[in-house]
Structure formats: C-alpha cells, structure tokens
C-alpha cells in the first residue's frame, strides 16, 4: 500500500512531522525552510510496494514493469517504479542477485528538493527508513547517485546494503538528474518529474534541450561532497520528525557511513575532505571519479580516448574482445579514422596496422591499462567518450544553449537526424528512463559544423572528436577546484577500483589517491580488483566473462568490513590486489 503525505502509524508524531517538514526546524523563526516545498512522505507496506524494488521484487526487476500507458507516468508511484526498475537494470548484474527471496523492504520514504544557497546549488535527495530501523541504535548511510543520475541512482549499488542492515539511507542527486528544459517548446521537467509549462523563447537552435549536468547555472561538481553532507544533516532532522519520542538524532549518537560508486564515490571522498566536524564515521568509495594534482582529469582522458580509440581498437584481438564483432562490421570507418589521425600527425605508421598499433601504444603510455583497452569496442558501441566529453565541455566552459561548445546540442531527432520536439509520451518517461547525460531517453547528441549542417554525434565523428579534444587544455585549467588531496581524517575508509576499469582509469585516480591517503590515515585501505571493470551490467555482454568479474560483491563486503570495525572492533582487511 502506498500512502502519500500522511502521518506515520505513530500518530502522536504526525503534527510534529508536518511542522518540521514545513519549517526545517522546530523553531520556524530561527531557521527558514531549506526546501522548495515540504518533503513528500510515503509509506510502503513491503508487499504491494516497497523501498528496494518498488513492489516488483526480484522477479519483477528482471521483467518489463506493467506500465503500458505513458499517461500513467504522471503519477508518482508509476514514475518511481519505472525509475527504480531502470536503475537496477543499468547498474548491477541481476543474474547474480544474492539478497534473498524477493527482497521487498517495508518502510517510510521522503523525497526532498533543497533550495540553492550562496555556497551550494539546489539538489534533491531521497531518504528511506526501513521498518527494521532501530531508533535506539540508529545508523544512517549517506550516498550520492552515480554518474549524472537522479535520486534513485545509488539504490541498487550501496542503498540496498544500508536498507538490508536496517539503516536509514539518504541519497543526493548532486543537483543533476533529469532536470530538462525546452525553451523553444515551452516546457520543463522538474526534479520530481512533473512537466511544467514555461514561456517560449526564440533560439537559433530549435528544440535544443537544457540539461542540468551540462547547463546548470551553478556548477555542482566542486560541491558534490558538501551536497552529500547537507543531505545527511537534513536526513537527521527528518529522522527526528519521524521519531519525536526519542532524543534528537545527531552525528554523535548515530552511526553514519558514507558510500558511493563512480561520481558518487567522488562525492564521498570530497565529503571526507570537507567534513571538519567528523560527521561521517566511515566510508567506502568504489571506482571514484576523482581528480588528483598532476594527473589528467576525466575530460582529458575521455577526449584522448575519443580521438585515438576508434583507430586503436583495430590493434586488439577482435575475435576475443567483447563486441569486437561490431568493429569488424565497420572496418571501413575505423580504417578511415586511422587515416585522418595520420594526416593530422597524431599517429605514425604507413598502413592501418601500424597506425592502430601506434594509437594503442599512445593510450598505454598515457596510463591506460591493457585490460581497459580490451573493452574499447564496448566503449565505442555505447558512445561513451562522446557522451562524457559533450556534456562536460558545456559544464566546464559554462556554455549556454545558444553558444554550444563544438556546435553540440542535446535534442530529440527525427528519422532524418533533424531536431524535433519530444512528444508528450516521451516527456512523460524522461524522469524514469533518463540517466541525466545524453544520449538518453530519446535525447540525442547532435553537432553542427561551420556551415550549419547537422550530424548525429551519439557515436561521434572525427571532426567532433577533434574539436572536443582541442578544448582539453583550457578545460584542464578549469578543473583545479576539483582536486582532492587524500585527506580522509582518522576514520576507516576503503577505496576499491577495478584494474580493468575502462571509464575511470585506476592509475590516474584511485592508485594516486591511495598513495596520499595511506600516508595520512592508518585506517585507510585500498583494494584493487584485478579483473574488475566499471559497469557490472555490462557483464551480460558476450565475451565479458570470465575475463571480468562483478564489483558489487566487493562493495558489499567492504561495507560489511567498515561496519564490523565500528560496531564489533574487527580488523579491517589489508590493502592489496584481489584476483
């Protein structure tokens, strides 16, 4: 049963819950509400609907949810269910479900939208309180969504662990998610998934969509850690509203663990460096997208891959490489790419074989692992590098819709590749189906050349890749605010990373971070998963196994380890390479 905006079964707490949600504190005059609107409160019975699987259970997560009519997605319950279903399928390998039975978890859920302040952008967070939560032995898992995802973007990876332990879980979207605006179409998608009309605006790029990660007026990335801390502190207030009969929940009387993967892992490590008050007791970060002094940032190595990998892939063993067969079907395109690189003096060699070998060698020399290069065909097939570079270029250069970097826009396209307006049914599915970064949910990447011609850039073109790469020097100067220094405090912290990670290179991120953190914190541990890679869901692709293993079991085990250290005094695992 779903009950929205109603009191807890603990009826005595109902009035105080309502007051705290509106005021943000017991004394409304002392502190104005941090929220755009009172957080929505929902209760789930664990049978027809639940916190972990939206009532779908394990079986339902592996099937298409029963939502046929797009109009039904106007209801929060249906948007939520589809969003949770999409997150599970995108982030974990459901073939390896190991959480028991149908894994439905009853409890209370808050959805909150926090205002921007002078120091922090707006963001949304999800607070889930399982029925097994013990207010007398409270624990809170604080996390942030991976990638550019919305509030459900960490539920399958770290949120599920917290819920199964009886911990409350708060997940912040880092100000990203599917906040989408179509100025020429006259509508916007709010953080809660509602379509709202806005005044139409003329644009030289009709139907170009404004997306939060690419175009937000307040760049959130330098603040991901503080957003995570803000969500954690507000979560304690909501817990106090939910359990008014006990003393206030504070960092001193609540076990608080921070955890996240990818961009969520970066948010965790940023939070540790900003956490002077020791709000967090322990942390786990998997494959974190962190920027270290002296190392290239994500944009740098993404654009290097975008330039070289379409040629370098021909130097891999395509009969064994996952999706290598797709490269074999497009040899002419890859051969031509090698030719263009040679013409521009970016690779050496007199034929395609020598040029591909040189391109591969240049990637290796830049610090990319051979195991990661083996996944080059997967990266190219999914347009990974163009997706990353196209969004981050707009973000770092602070480009608006009318002055896009490299002529790149995000828009729906017709059969001829021309921009069009998203249909009503497509807009209805954006919140649930979108990842926050194009291409996604019917939103494509298009590039305009100097003459105004359009091309679909989901899979990139040589000219688009070259343009994006040309911005790397300017952008590297703009990413200095993202540098982390390995300051974790004297608390248990485990960082883990796959040696075959083909998105976030281990040599430029976690290994460097570990060398700094280990010297400062005797409770810091670094686990390198030799055969791990970035996307567990990719393990279902033919050719991925047995060469690669899932990261999720190591994430769960690391969370078990820091919890046992804090609650039972058990020793932390030794740092090392796990095979």
Which role fits each region the language model picked out?
Residues 2-15:
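Bacterial N-terminal signal peptides that target proteins for export
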Residues 14-24:
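Bacterial N-terminal signal peptides
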Residues 26-30:
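Sec/Tat signal peptide C-region and signal peptidase I cleavage site
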Residues 31-579:
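C-terminal His-loop and adjacent cap/lid subdomain of alpha/beta-hydrolase
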């Amino acid at each position: 049963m779903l009950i929205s905006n109603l009191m807890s079964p603990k009826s005595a707490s109902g009035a105080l819950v309502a007051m705290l949600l509106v005021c943000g504190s017991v004394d409304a005059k002392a502190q104005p509400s941090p929220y755009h609107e009172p957080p929505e409160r929902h209760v789930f019975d664990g049978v027809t609907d639940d916190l972990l699987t939206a009532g779908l259970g394990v079986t339902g997560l592996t099937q298409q949810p029963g939502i046929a009519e797009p109009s039904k997605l106007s209801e929060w319950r249906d948007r939520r269910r589809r969003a949770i279903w999409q997150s599970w399928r995108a982030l974990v390998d459901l073939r390896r479900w190991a959480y028991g039975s149908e894994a439905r978890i009853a409890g209370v859920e808050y959805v909150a939208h926090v205002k921007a302040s002078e120091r922090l952008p707006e963001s949304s967070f999800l607070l889930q309180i399982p029925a097994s939560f013990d207010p007398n032995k409270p624990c809170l898992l604080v996390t942030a969504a991976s990638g550019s995802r919305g509030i459900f973007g960490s539920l399958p990876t770290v949120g599920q662990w917290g819920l199964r332990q009886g911990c409350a879980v708060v997940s912040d979207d880092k100000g990203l998610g599917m906040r989408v605006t179509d100025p020429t179409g006259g509508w916007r998608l709010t953080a809660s998934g509602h379509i709202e009309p806005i005044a139409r605006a003329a644009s030289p790029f009709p139907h170009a969509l404004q997306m939060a990660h690419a175009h937000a007026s307040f760049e959130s990335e330098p603040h991901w850690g503080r957003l995570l801390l803000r969500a954690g502190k507000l979560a304690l207030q909501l817990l106090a509203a939910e359990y008014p009969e006990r003393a206030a929940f504070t960092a001193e009387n609540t076990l608080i663990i921070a955890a996240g993967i990818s961009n969520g892992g970066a948010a965790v490590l940023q939070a540790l460096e900003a956490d002077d008050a020791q709000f967090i007791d322990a942390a786990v970060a998997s494959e974190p997208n962190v920027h270290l002094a002296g190392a290239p940032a994500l944009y740098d190595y993404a654009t290097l891959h975008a330039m070289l990998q379409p040629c370098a892939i021909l130097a891999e063993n395509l009969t064994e490489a996952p999706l290598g067969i797709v490269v074999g079907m497009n040899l002419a395109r890859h051969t031509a790419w090698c030719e263009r690189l040679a013409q521009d003096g970016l690779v050496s060699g007199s034929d395609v074989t020598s040029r591909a070998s040189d391109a591969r060698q240049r990637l290796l020399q830049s610090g990319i692992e051979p195991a990661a290069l083996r996944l080059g065909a997967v990266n190219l097939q999914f347009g990974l590098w163009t997706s990353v570079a196209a969004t981050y270029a707009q973000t770092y250069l602070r480009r608006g819709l009318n002055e896009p970097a490299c002529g790149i826009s995000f828009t729906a396209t017709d059969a001829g590749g021309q921009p069009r307006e998203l249909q009503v049914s497509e807009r209805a599915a954006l919140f649930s189906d979108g990842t926050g970064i194009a291409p996604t949910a019917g939103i494509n990447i298009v590039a305009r050349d100097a003459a105004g011609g359009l091309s679909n850039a989901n899979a990139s073109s040589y000219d688009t890749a070259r343009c994006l790469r040309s911005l790397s020097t300017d952008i590297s100067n703009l990413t200095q605010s993202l540098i982390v220094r390995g300051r974790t405090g004297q608390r248990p912290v485990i960082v883990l990373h796959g040696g075959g990670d083909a998105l976030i290179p281990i040599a430029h991120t976690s290994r460097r971070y570990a060398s700094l953190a280990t010297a400062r914190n005797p409770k810091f541990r670094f686990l390198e998963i030799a055969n791990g890679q970035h996307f567990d869901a990719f393990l279902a692709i033919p050719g991925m196994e047995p060469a690669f293993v899932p990261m999720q079991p190591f994430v769960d085990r690391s969370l078990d380890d820091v919890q046992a250290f804090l609650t039972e005094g058990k020793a932390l695992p030794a740092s090392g390479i796990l095979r």
